[in-house]
């Protein structure tokens, strides 16, 4: 996972909104909450993009609650059946659930950070075999045949988040290259 200042995916992962509560009065920042007031007062809740929430939280200007995509409800669903959770729905269609979760864990205290990292790891390891099988199937499938979009595999594919879609594409390309190599070797015998 790249965490580069100039990376579009890194920028997109930092753009998710977080609910923050100001821990002190902030003069001249009233525009952040869309208010006509010039200042933000202590205890005011504001939705901020992650990149700003992170900076304000690290400097103890704000506190935040854990975003819904990483809540105990989502964690329980991932434990029950990792492949049935539509990660794309949790962070938006082109969202980056793993990247945002990693960045979130990096700014949390020990126990919470460990819980988030473990959730990310369990989700990834629980979903990877299905992702790999699906990529291999799509790489070798005869795409002239109509496929059922309601199958579990297609539902999983629709629920993949950004990093999973990248891995899926790499897996498809790899499968096609292997098939082409195998067909060449088989034909030369």
Swiss-Prot record:
Membrane-spanning residues: none
InterPro entries: GINS_A, GINS_bundle-like_dom_sf, GINS_Psf3, GINS_Psf3_sf, PSF3_N
One Pfam family per UniProt: Sld5
Keyword set, alphabetical order: DNA replication, Nucleus
GO cellular component: GINS complex
Statement: the UniProt record of this protein carries the keyword Protein biosynthesis: no
Broad class of the protein's primary localization: nucleus
Any one GO BP annotation for this protein: mitotic DNA replication initiation
Gene that this sequence comes from: PSF3
Name of the protein in question: DNA replication complex GINS protein PSF3
Record function comment: The GINS complex plays an essential role in the initiation of DNA replication.
